[in-house]
From Swiss-Prot:
B, as annotated region: 336-405
Name of the protein: Nuclear envelope integral membrane protein 1
GO term, biological process aspect, one: erythrocyte enucleation
Gene giving rise to this polypeptide: NEMP1
Keywords annotated in UniProt: Erythrocyte maturation, Glycoprotein, Membrane, Nucleus, Phosphoprotein, Signal, Transmembrane, Transmembrane helix
In-chain residues carrying the UniProt-annotated modification Phosphoserine: S368, S424, S425
Stretches with biased composition (Acidic residues): 418-430
Region span, A: 186-297
Homology family: Belongs to the NEMP family.
Amino acid sequence: MAGGMKVAVLPAVGAGPWSWGAGGCGAVRLLLVLFGCFVCGSAGIDLNVVTLRESEILFMNTSRQSCYKNVLIPKWHDIWTRIQIRVNSSKLVRVTQVENEDKLKELEQFSIWNFFSSFLKEKLNDTYINVGLYSTKTCLKVEILEEDTKYSVIVTRRFDPKLFLIFLLGLTLFFCGDLLSRSQIFYYSTGMSVGIVASLLIIIFIVSKFMPKKSPIYIILVGGWSFSLYLIQLVFKNLQEIWRCYWQYLLSYVLAVGFMSFAVCYKYGPLENERSINLLTWTLQLLGLCFMYSSIQIPHIALAIVVIALCTKNLDYPIHWLYITYRKMCKATEKTVPPRLLTEEEYRLQGEVETRKALEQLREYCNSPDCSAWKTVSRIQSPKRFADFVEGSFHLTPNEVSVHEQEYGLGSIIAQDELSEETSSEEEDSDSRYPLVVQQNSFLT
Protein backbone atom coordinates (compact mmCIF):
# COMPACT_ATOMS: atom_id res chain seq x y z
CA MET A 1 0.00 0.00 0.00
CA ALA A 2 1.02 3.64 -0.33
CA GLY A 3 3.20 5.00 2.41
CA GLY A 4 4.88 1.67 3.00
CA MET A 5 2.29 0.46 5.55
CA LYS A 6 2.73 -3.18 6.47
CA VAL A 7 -0.10 -5.39 7.57
CA ALA A 8 0.64 -8.28 9.92
CA VAL A 9 -1.54 -11.35 9.50
CA LEU A 10 -2.47 -13.01 12.83
CA PRO A 11 -3.84 -16.52 13.19
CA ALA A 12 -7.58 -16.82 13.50
CA VAL A 13 -8.82 -16.77 17.06
CA GLY A 14 -10.59 -19.92 18.06
CA ALA A 15 -9.35 -21.91 15.10
CA GLY A 16 -8.30 -24.86 17.26
CA PRO A 17 -10.72 -27.24 18.86
CA TRP A 18 -9.73 -26.16 22.41
CA SER A 19 -9.92 -22.42 21.71
CA TRP A 20 -12.75 -20.34 23.23
CA GLY A 21 -12.32 -17.01 21.50
CA ALA A 22 -12.53 -13.66 23.21
CA GLY A 23 -16.03 -14.23 24.57
CA GLY A 24 -15.21 -17.75 25.66
CA CYS A 25 -12.14 -16.61 27.60
CA GLY A 26 -14.28 -14.03 29.40
CA ALA A 27 -16.85 -16.65 30.36
CA VAL A 28 -14.14 -18.99 31.62
CA ARG A 29 -12.56 -16.23 33.67
CA LEU A 30 -15.97 -15.35 35.16
CA LEU A 31 -16.63 -18.95 36.13
CA LEU A 32 -13.16 -19.26 37.65
CA VAL A 33 -13.69 -16.09 39.68
CA LEU A 34 -17.09 -17.26 40.90
CA PHE A 35 -15.69 -20.67 41.79
CA GLY A 36 -12.83 -19.04 43.68
CA CYS A 37 -15.25 -16.83 45.57
CA PHE A 38 -17.38 -19.87 46.29
CA VAL A 39 -14.41 -21.85 47.64
CA CYS A 40 -13.07 -18.95 49.65
CA GLY A 41 -16.48 -18.16 51.02
CA SER A 42 -17.19 -21.73 52.01
CA ALA A 43 -13.83 -22.01 53.67
CA GLY A 44 -14.27 -18.88 55.72
CA ILE A 45 -17.89 -19.31 56.87
CA ASP A 46 -18.20 -19.30 60.63
CA LEU A 47 -21.79 -19.64 61.86
CA ASN A 48 -23.04 -18.36 65.16
CA VAL A 49 -25.91 -20.78 65.79
CA VAL A 50 -28.37 -20.13 68.61
CA THR A 51 -29.58 -23.21 70.50
CA LEU A 52 -33.34 -23.41 70.96
CA ARG A 53 -34.93 -24.96 74.05
CA GLU A 54 -38.51 -25.94 74.69
CA SER A 55 -40.79 -23.27 76.22
CA GLU A 56 -37.98 -20.69 76.06
CA ILE A 57 -38.65 -17.50 74.07
CA LEU A 58 -35.76 -15.83 72.24
CA PHE A 59 -36.10 -12.22 71.08
CA MET A 60 -33.87 -11.08 68.20
CA ASN A 61 -33.66 -8.20 65.75
CA THR A 62 -31.06 -9.44 63.24
CA SER A 63 -30.83 -12.30 60.78
CA ARG A 64 -29.75 -15.35 62.79
CA GLN A 65 -29.41 -19.10 62.51
CA SER A 66 -30.78 -21.37 65.22
CA CYS A 67 -31.07 -25.10 65.86
CA TYR A 68 -33.28 -27.30 68.04
CA LYS A 69 -32.05 -30.68 69.26
CA ASN A 70 -34.69 -33.24 70.22
CA VAL A 71 -33.38 -35.46 73.01
CA LEU A 72 -36.64 -37.04 74.25
CA ILE A 73 -37.62 -40.50 73.05
CA PRO A 74 -41.30 -40.64 72.02
CA LYS A 75 -43.59 -42.75 74.22
CA TRP A 76 -46.92 -44.37 73.37
CA HIS A 77 -48.86 -41.48 74.91
CA ASP A 78 -47.21 -39.04 72.46
CA ILE A 79 -49.27 -40.24 69.50
CA TRP A 80 -51.06 -36.88 69.25
CA THR A 81 -48.15 -34.73 70.44
CA ARG A 82 -46.74 -32.10 68.11
CA ILE A 83 -43.45 -30.19 68.31
CA GLN A 84 -43.60 -26.75 66.71
CA ILE A 85 -41.17 -23.89 66.24
CA ARG A 86 -42.98 -20.56 65.97
CA VAL A 87 -41.37 -17.44 64.51
CA ASN A 88 -43.47 -14.35 65.24
CA SER A 89 -42.21 -11.02 63.89
CA SER A 90 -43.36 -7.42 63.71
CA LYS A 91 -42.68 -7.28 59.96
CA LEU A 92 -42.28 -9.77 57.14
CA VAL A 93 -39.38 -12.22 57.47
CA ARG A 94 -38.13 -15.17 55.42
CA VAL A 95 -37.70 -18.47 57.29
CA THR A 96 -35.76 -21.41 55.83
CA GLN A 97 -35.75 -24.85 57.48
CA VAL A 98 -32.85 -27.32 57.09
CA GLU A 99 -31.67 -30.50 58.79
CA ASN A 100 -28.36 -29.53 60.43
CA GLU A 101 -25.56 -26.97 60.64
CA ASP A 102 -23.93 -28.17 57.42
CA LYS A 103 -27.07 -27.25 55.52
CA LEU A 104 -26.98 -23.84 57.17
CA LYS A 105 -23.46 -23.35 55.81
CA GLU A 106 -24.68 -24.28 52.35
CA LEU A 107 -27.36 -21.60 52.64
CA GLU A 108 -24.66 -19.00 53.26
CA GLN A 109 -22.80 -20.08 50.12
CA PHE A 110 -23.68 -18.61 46.75
CA SER A 111 -25.54 -20.88 44.34
CA ILE A 112 -28.02 -20.42 41.56
CA TRP A 113 -30.60 -22.57 43.39
CA ASN A 114 -30.32 -20.57 46.61
CA PHE A 115 -30.54 -17.36 44.63
CA PHE A 116 -33.83 -18.29 42.93
CA SER A 117 -35.35 -20.11 45.92
CA SER A 118 -34.91 -16.97 48.02
CA PHE A 119 -37.41 -15.24 45.73
CA LEU A 120 -39.86 -18.14 45.81
CA LYS A 121 -40.01 -18.54 49.58
CA GLU A 122 -42.97 -16.97 51.32
CA LYS A 123 -42.45 -13.96 53.51
CA LEU A 124 -44.63 -14.09 56.62
CA ASN A 125 -44.77 -12.47 60.01
CA ASP A 126 -46.04 -15.61 61.77
CA THR A 127 -44.48 -18.92 60.75
CA TYR A 128 -45.01 -22.40 62.21
CA ILE A 129 -42.47 -25.16 61.58
CA ASN A 130 -43.47 -28.72 62.48
CA VAL A 131 -40.74 -30.96 63.88
CA GLY A 132 -41.03 -34.74 63.81
CA LEU A 133 -40.91 -36.63 67.10
CA TYR A 134 -38.07 -38.78 65.75
CA SER A 135 -36.15 -35.85 64.26
CA THR A 136 -32.89 -35.42 66.17
CA LYS A 137 -32.09 -31.91 64.99
CA THR A 138 -33.83 -29.13 63.11
CA CYS A 139 -32.21 -25.86 62.08
CA LEU A 140 -33.65 -22.70 60.62
CA LYS A 141 -32.46 -19.42 59.21
CA VAL A 142 -34.45 -16.23 59.78
CA GLU A 143 -33.77 -13.37 57.37
CA ILE A 144 -35.17 -9.93 58.08
CA LEU A 145 -36.18 -7.88 55.05
CA GLU A 146 -36.60 -4.47 56.66
CA GLU A 147 -34.78 -2.56 59.31
CA ASP A 148 -36.16 -2.36 62.85
CA THR A 149 -37.70 -5.81 62.54
CA LYS A 150 -38.10 -7.66 65.81
CA TYR A 151 -39.06 -11.29 66.07
CA SER A 152 -39.32 -14.07 68.62
CA VAL A 153 -38.62 -17.79 68.35
CA ILE A 154 -40.18 -20.40 70.66
CA VAL A 155 -40.32 -24.22 70.67
CA THR A 156 -43.45 -25.91 72.07
CA ARG A 157 -44.30 -29.57 72.70
CA ARG A 158 -47.99 -30.10 73.39
CA PHE A 159 -51.07 -32.20 72.69
CA ASP A 160 -52.56 -31.14 69.37
CA PRO A 161 -56.38 -31.40 69.30
CA LYS A 162 -56.36 -31.10 65.51
CA LEU A 163 -54.55 -34.43 65.22
CA PHE A 164 -57.11 -36.06 67.51
CA LEU A 165 -60.02 -34.65 65.49
CA ILE A 166 -58.42 -35.87 62.25
CA PHE A 167 -58.09 -39.33 63.82
CA LEU A 168 -61.78 -39.33 64.81
CA LEU A 169 -62.70 -38.20 61.29
CA GLY A 170 -60.70 -41.06 59.79
CA LEU A 171 -62.27 -43.53 62.22
CA THR A 172 -65.75 -42.33 61.25
CA LEU A 173 -65.05 -42.49 57.52
CA PHE A 174 -63.63 -46.01 57.77
CA PHE A 175 -66.30 -47.65 59.92
CA CYS A 176 -69.28 -45.65 58.62
CA GLY A 177 -68.25 -45.38 54.97
CA ASP A 178 -70.97 -47.75 53.78
CA LEU A 179 -73.65 -45.75 55.60
CA LEU A 180 -72.30 -42.37 54.48
CA SER A 181 -72.15 -43.43 50.84
CA ARG A 182 -75.91 -44.10 50.95
CA SER A 183 -76.81 -41.00 52.97
CA GLN A 184 -78.43 -38.10 51.13
CA ILE A 185 -77.31 -35.62 53.78
CA PHE A 186 -73.68 -36.65 53.29
CA TYR A 187 -74.10 -36.48 49.51
CA TYR A 188 -75.42 -32.92 49.45
CA SER A 189 -73.10 -31.59 52.17
CA THR A 190 -70.03 -33.08 50.50
CA GLY A 191 -71.06 -31.75 47.10
CA MET A 192 -71.58 -28.24 48.45
CA SER A 193 -68.27 -28.31 50.33
CA VAL A 194 -66.32 -29.46 47.28
CA GLY A 195 -68.03 -26.81 45.17
CA ILE A 196 -67.15 -24.05 47.63
CA VAL A 197 -63.54 -25.09 48.17
CA ALA A 198 -62.58 -26.13 44.63
CA SER A 199 -64.82 -23.96 42.46
CA LEU A 200 -61.88 -22.70 40.40
CA LEU A 201 -60.66 -26.25 39.81
CA ILE A 202 -64.15 -27.27 38.69
CA ILE A 203 -64.31 -24.37 36.23
CA ILE A 204 -60.95 -25.35 34.74
CA PHE A 205 -62.12 -28.97 34.47
CA ILE A 206 -65.32 -27.93 32.67
CA VAL A 207 -63.38 -25.68 30.28
CA SER A 208 -60.99 -28.54 29.48
CA LYS A 209 -63.94 -30.61 28.22
CA PHE A 210 -64.58 -28.10 25.44
CA MET A 211 -60.95 -27.83 24.35
CA PRO A 212 -59.83 -29.74 21.23
CA LYS A 213 -57.41 -32.58 21.66
CA LYS A 214 -53.68 -31.94 21.20
CA SER A 215 -54.19 -28.25 21.76
CA PRO A 216 -51.56 -25.94 23.27
CA ILE A 217 -54.25 -24.65 25.61
CA TYR A 218 -53.67 -27.74 27.79
CA ILE A 219 -50.38 -26.25 28.93
CA ILE A 220 -52.30 -23.24 30.19
CA LEU A 221 -54.84 -25.52 31.86
CA VAL A 222 -52.10 -27.43 33.69
CA GLY A 223 -50.71 -24.13 34.88
CA GLY A 224 -54.23 -23.12 35.90
CA TRP A 225 -54.60 -26.26 38.02
CA SER A 226 -51.32 -25.54 39.80
CA PHE A 227 -52.25 -21.90 40.28
CA SER A 228 -55.66 -22.90 41.64
CA LEU A 229 -54.11 -25.25 44.18
CA TYR A 230 -51.73 -22.50 45.23
CA LEU A 231 -54.64 -20.07 45.65
CA ILE A 232 -56.58 -22.58 47.77
CA GLN A 233 -53.54 -23.10 50.01
CA LEU A 234 -53.01 -19.34 50.29
CA VAL A 235 -56.65 -18.70 51.17
CA PHE A 236 -56.64 -21.32 53.91
CA LYS A 237 -53.49 -19.86 55.41
CA ASN A 238 -54.99 -16.38 55.51
CA LEU A 239 -58.62 -17.33 56.09
CA GLN A 240 -58.89 -15.50 59.39
CA GLU A 241 -57.52 -12.28 57.92
CA ILE A 242 -59.77 -12.57 54.85
CA TRP A 243 -62.84 -13.08 57.04
CA ARG A 244 -61.94 -10.09 59.18
CA CYS A 245 -61.43 -7.69 56.26
CA TYR A 246 -63.68 -9.05 53.51
CA TRP A 247 -66.37 -11.02 55.33
CA GLN A 248 -69.16 -9.60 53.10
CA TYR A 249 -67.53 -10.89 49.92
CA LEU A 250 -66.62 -14.21 51.50
CA LEU A 251 -70.17 -14.76 52.78
CA SER A 252 -71.65 -13.85 49.39
CA TYR A 253 -69.26 -16.27 47.67
CA VAL A 254 -70.14 -19.10 50.05
CA LEU A 255 -73.89 -18.58 49.63
CA ALA A 256 -73.78 -18.24 45.84
CA VAL A 257 -71.42 -21.13 45.14
CA GLY A 258 -73.10 -23.29 47.78
CA PHE A 259 -76.51 -22.78 46.16
CA MET A 260 -75.15 -23.60 42.70
CA SER A 261 -73.42 -26.72 44.04
CA PHE A 262 -76.66 -27.82 45.71
CA ALA A 263 -78.54 -27.28 42.44
CA VAL A 264 -76.06 -29.44 40.53
CA CYS A 265 -76.22 -32.20 43.16
CA TYR A 266 -80.03 -32.03 43.16
CA LYS A 267 -80.14 -32.31 39.37
CA TYR A 268 -78.07 -35.49 39.22
CA GLY A 269 -79.36 -36.93 42.50
CA PRO A 270 -77.66 -39.34 44.93
CA LEU A 271 -75.91 -42.47 43.75
CA GLU A 272 -78.21 -45.39 42.94
CA ASN A 273 -75.94 -47.81 41.11
CA GLU A 274 -74.60 -50.39 43.54
CA ARG A 275 -71.15 -50.42 41.96
CA SER A 276 -70.87 -46.64 42.23
CA ILE A 277 -71.90 -46.84 45.87
CA ASN A 278 -69.25 -49.51 46.48
CA LEU A 279 -66.58 -47.35 44.83
CA LEU A 280 -67.56 -44.39 47.01
CA THR A 281 -67.52 -46.62 50.10
CA TRP A 282 -64.03 -47.92 49.34
CA THR A 283 -62.81 -44.39 48.64
CA LEU A 284 -64.14 -43.14 51.97
CA GLN A 285 -62.61 -46.09 53.81
CA LEU A 286 -59.23 -45.56 52.14
CA LEU A 287 -59.39 -41.86 52.97
CA GLY A 288 -60.23 -42.74 56.56
CA LEU A 289 -57.20 -45.02 56.82
CA CYS A 290 -54.98 -42.22 55.46
CA PHE A 291 -56.39 -39.79 58.02
CA MET A 292 -55.81 -42.25 60.87
CA TYR A 293 -52.24 -42.97 59.80
CA SER A 294 -51.30 -39.32 59.24
CA SER A 295 -52.82 -38.11 62.53
CA ILE A 296 -50.67 -40.41 64.69
CA GLN A 297 -47.11 -39.15 65.14
CA ILE A 298 -45.53 -42.54 65.96
CA PRO A 299 -45.32 -44.61 62.74
CA HIS A 300 -45.38 -48.14 64.19
CA ILE A 301 -48.36 -47.36 66.41
CA ALA A 302 -50.13 -45.78 63.44
CA LEU A 303 -49.49 -48.91 61.36
CA ALA A 304 -50.74 -51.15 64.18
CA ILE A 305 -53.97 -49.15 64.51
CA VAL A 306 -54.55 -49.34 60.76
CA VAL A 307 -54.09 -53.14 60.82
CA ILE A 308 -56.43 -53.48 63.82
CA ALA A 309 -59.05 -51.37 62.06
CA LEU A 310 -58.82 -53.54 58.94
CA CYS A 311 -59.13 -56.73 60.97
CA THR A 312 -62.05 -55.40 62.99
CA LYS A 313 -63.90 -54.31 59.86
CA ASN A 314 -63.31 -57.34 57.65
CA LEU A 315 -62.81 -60.31 59.99
CA ASP A 316 -66.22 -60.28 61.67
CA TYR A 317 -67.58 -62.90 59.26
CA PRO A 318 -64.66 -65.36 59.69
CA ILE A 319 -64.86 -64.92 63.47
CA HIS A 320 -68.60 -65.61 63.38
CA TRP A 321 -68.00 -68.69 61.23
CA LEU A 322 -65.33 -69.96 63.64
CA TYR A 323 -67.69 -69.44 66.57
CA ILE A 324 -70.46 -71.41 64.86
CA THR A 325 -68.01 -74.21 64.02
CA TYR A 326 -66.82 -74.31 67.63
CA ARG A 327 -70.40 -74.57 68.90
CA LYS A 328 -71.14 -77.42 66.50
CA MET A 329 -68.02 -79.29 67.58
CA CYS A 330 -68.93 -78.85 71.23
CA LYS A 331 -72.42 -80.18 70.58
CA ALA A 332 -71.02 -83.16 68.67
CA THR A 333 -68.60 -84.14 71.44
CA GLU A 334 -70.92 -83.72 74.41
CA LYS A 335 -73.28 -86.54 75.43
CA THR A 336 -76.90 -86.21 74.41
CA VAL A 337 -79.12 -85.80 77.46
CA PRO A 338 -82.75 -86.91 76.99
CA PRO A 339 -85.29 -84.19 77.65
CA ARG A 340 -86.93 -84.18 81.07
CA LEU A 341 -90.54 -85.29 81.13
CA LEU A 342 -93.17 -83.15 82.82
CA THR A 343 -94.81 -84.29 85.98
CA GLU A 344 -98.58 -84.61 86.13
CA GLU A 345 -98.91 -81.38 88.11
CA GLU A 346 -96.64 -79.47 85.66
CA TYR A 347 -98.61 -80.87 82.75
CA ARG A 348 -101.93 -79.75 84.29
CA LEU A 349 -100.62 -76.24 85.07
CA GLN A 350 -99.14 -75.81 81.62
CA GLY A 351 -102.41 -76.93 80.04
CA GLU A 352 -104.39 -74.43 82.09
CA VAL A 353 -102.03 -71.56 81.20
CA GLU A 354 -102.02 -72.32 77.49
CA THR A 355 -105.80 -72.84 77.44
CA ARG A 356 -106.40 -69.50 79.14
CA LYS A 357 -104.02 -67.80 76.72
CA ALA A 358 -105.70 -69.36 73.66
CA LEU A 359 -109.16 -68.34 74.91
CA GLU A 360 -108.05 -64.72 75.32
CA GLN A 361 -106.65 -64.72 71.79
CA LEU A 362 -109.96 -66.16 70.53
CA ARG A 363 -111.94 -63.38 72.28
CA GLU A 364 -109.66 -60.71 70.81
CA TYR A 365 -110.10 -62.14 67.33
CA CYS A 366 -113.90 -62.31 67.68
CA ASN A 367 -114.01 -58.67 68.80
CA SER A 368 -111.72 -57.52 65.97
CA PRO A 369 -112.96 -56.25 62.58
CA ASP A 370 -111.30 -59.23 60.87
CA CYS A 371 -113.90 -61.64 62.29
CA SER A 372 -117.05 -62.19 60.19
CA ALA A 373 -119.77 -62.39 62.87
CA TRP A 374 -122.61 -63.69 60.66
CA LYS A 375 -120.50 -66.41 59.11
CA THR A 376 -119.29 -67.50 62.55
CA VAL A 377 -122.81 -67.57 64.03
CA SER A 378 -124.09 -69.63 61.10
CA ARG A 379 -121.55 -72.36 61.84
CA ILE A 380 -122.19 -72.89 65.57
CA GLN A 381 -125.07 -74.67 67.31
CA SER A 382 -125.44 -72.33 70.32
CA PRO A 383 -125.09 -68.65 69.28
CA LYS A 384 -126.18 -67.35 72.70
CA ARG A 385 -123.49 -69.33 74.48
CA PHE A 386 -120.91 -68.10 71.98
CA ALA A 387 -122.02 -64.49 72.52
CA ASP A 388 -121.73 -64.91 76.30
CA PHE A 389 -118.22 -66.32 75.85
CA VAL A 390 -117.16 -63.35 73.69
CA GLU A 391 -118.50 -60.96 76.35
CA GLY A 392 -116.34 -62.64 79.00
CA SER A 393 -118.33 -65.58 80.36
CA PHE A 394 -116.76 -68.94 81.15
CA HIS A 395 -116.49 -71.30 78.21
CA LEU A 396 -117.75 -74.43 80.06
CA THR A 397 -121.03 -75.23 81.78
CA PRO A 398 -121.11 -76.70 85.31
CA ASN A 399 -122.15 -80.12 83.94
CA GLU A 400 -119.18 -80.15 81.55
CA VAL A 401 -116.84 -79.25 84.40
CA SER A 402 -118.16 -82.06 86.61
CA VAL A 403 -117.93 -84.59 83.80
CA HIS A 404 -114.35 -83.49 83.08
CA GLU A 405 -113.43 -83.90 86.75
CA GLN A 406 -114.96 -87.37 86.83
CA GLU A 407 -113.23 -88.39 83.61
CA TYR A 408 -109.78 -86.80 84.11
CA GLY A 409 -109.74 -85.80 87.74
CA LEU A 410 -108.34 -87.66 90.76
CA GLY A 411 -111.58 -89.59 91.45
CA SER A 412 -111.77 -91.03 87.95
CA ILE A 413 -108.20 -92.23 88.15
CA ILE A 414 -108.90 -94.11 91.39
CA ALA A 415 -112.04 -95.59 89.89
CA GLN A 416 -110.12 -96.77 86.83
CA ASP A 417 -107.51 -98.38 89.09
CA GLU A 418 -110.19 -100.20 91.00
CA LEU A 419 -111.77 -101.42 87.80
CA SER A 420 -108.45 -102.77 86.52
CA GLU A 421 -107.84 -104.74 89.71
CA GLU A 422 -111.06 -106.74 89.43
CA THR A 423 -110.81 -110.03 87.61
CA SER A 424 -112.42 -110.58 84.27
CA SER A 425 -114.13 -113.74 85.59
CA GLU A 426 -116.79 -111.63 87.36
CA GLU A 427 -118.91 -111.20 84.30
CA GLU A 428 -122.01 -110.05 86.12
CA ASP A 429 -120.23 -107.19 87.81
CA SER A 430 -118.70 -106.08 84.54
CA ASP A 431 -122.12 -106.25 82.84
CA SER A 432 -123.64 -104.11 85.58
CA ARG A 433 -120.98 -101.43 85.10
CA TYR A 434 -121.26 -101.36 81.32
CA PRO A 435 -124.54 -99.33 81.15
CA LEU A 436 -123.04 -96.71 83.46
CA VAL A 437 -120.12 -96.18 81.12
CA VAL A 438 -122.44 -95.97 78.13
CA GLN A 439 -124.58 -93.45 79.96
CA GLN A 440 -121.55 -91.25 80.71
CA ASN A 441 -120.35 -91.37 77.11
CA SER A 442 -123.78 -90.53 75.78
CA PHE A 443 -123.97 -87.58 78.18
CA LEU A 444 -120.64 -86.23 76.92
CA THR A 445 -121.81 -86.45 73.34
